[in-house]
């Protein structure tokens, strides 16, 4: 077995094969035990009190786990010692606190957000099969660009289509196969389809100008030096950084103001990922 340890922060990771990418950051009180491969991609953050027991755990790039209370993310649970206990997580996935049960494999796509206290359960009934109750152990598959609301439970055998929103406090008992849709309730049901608005270039430019105005207003509450920010769609220029808001690529130099803008913009669905992550290190006036 290969081992990664950080005694100062109580981080202990063991795996048969250990692949930790570049610029991966670990929090405190982390325990990960993987009997096969544990892999985490570049620029990922595994936060405090993250625990995992699995056969295989593959995490993509720019993964972010950041608990906001005394709990952490728990991966494993019943069946975690079996060879089917496999979890694959795509790129740019965000999660906080919650539980992913691995009685069967779980796959999570790219650009997925799991809100606080989301549980994924891959097994079924508590009651005995000798009494006639069903045996249920089934995979869970979550597509790309899915947001799962607070305190939602996703049950065994569920597949969730790409570009899906699941409302908070939902219980997902059956697959949600219609893409570009909002589901909610217990059990979760289709609420409505998502229609993507069509904006002209002029409207997009005006939207950028509005975003800039909001950011300038926010900065007026902070002790910051003079900075420059302007836009000509699809490009936004802030100090020495040039951002393409169509594909979220960038070039140039980062500073405290550009970091603050990226952190601000992600609240508008504009997520510009960089190796040092999202930061907002400004002082109020």
Give the positions of each predicted feature.
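Short, well-structured beta-strand-loop connectors
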Residues: 148, 166-167, 183-184
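Canonical bilayer-spanning transmembrane alpha-helix
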Residues: 163-167, 173
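Terminal amphipathic alpha-helical/low-complexity segments used for targeting or macromolecular assembly
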Residues: 1-10, 23, 111, 186-285
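C-terminal, active-site-flanking charged/polar segments
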Residues: 173-193
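Conserved catalytic segment of ABC-fold P-loop ATPases
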Residues: 161-164, 178-180
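Short beta-to-alpha loop/turn elements within the nucleotide-binding domains of ABC transporters
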Residues: 158, 170, 176
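Flexible, glycine/small-residue-enriched loop-and-beta-strand segment within the central core
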Residues: 15-20, 25-158, 187, 193-195
């Amino acid at each position: 077995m290969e081992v990664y340890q950080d005694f100062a922060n109580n981080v202990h990771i063991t795996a048969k094969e250990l692949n930790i990418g570049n610029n991966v950051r670990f929090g405190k009180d982390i325990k990960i035990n993987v009997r096969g491969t544990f892999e985490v991609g570049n620029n990922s953050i595994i936060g405090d009190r993250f625990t995992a027991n699995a056969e295989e755990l593959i995490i993509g790039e720019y993964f972010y786990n950041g608990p906001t209370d005394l709990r952490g993310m728990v991966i494993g649970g019943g069946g975690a010692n079996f060879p089917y206990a496999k979890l694959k997580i795509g790129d740019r996935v965000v999660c906080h606190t919650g539980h992913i049960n691995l009685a069967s494999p779980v796959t999570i796509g790219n650009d997925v957000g799991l809100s606080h206290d989301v549980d994924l359960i891959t097994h079924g009934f508590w009651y005995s099969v000798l009494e006639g109750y069903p045996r249920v152990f089934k995979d869970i598959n979550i597509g790309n660009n899915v947001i799962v609301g607070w305190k939602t439970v996703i049950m065994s055998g569920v597949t969730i289509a790409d570009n899906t929103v699941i409302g908070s406090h939902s219980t997902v008992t059956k697959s949600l196969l219609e893409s570009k849709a909002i589901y909610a309730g217990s059990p979760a049901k289709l609420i409505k389809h998502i229609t993507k608005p069509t904006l002209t270039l002029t409207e997009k430019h005006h939207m950028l100008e509005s975003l800039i105005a909001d950011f300038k207003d926010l900065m007026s509450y902070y002790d910051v030096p003079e900075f420059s920010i302007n836009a000509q769609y699809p490009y936004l220029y802030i100090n020495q950084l040039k951002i393409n808001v169509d594909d979220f690529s960038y070039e140039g130099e980062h500073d405290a103001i550009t970091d603050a803008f990226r952190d601000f913009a992600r609240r508008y669905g504009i997520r510009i990922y960089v190796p040092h992550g999202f930061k907002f290190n400004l002082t109020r006036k």
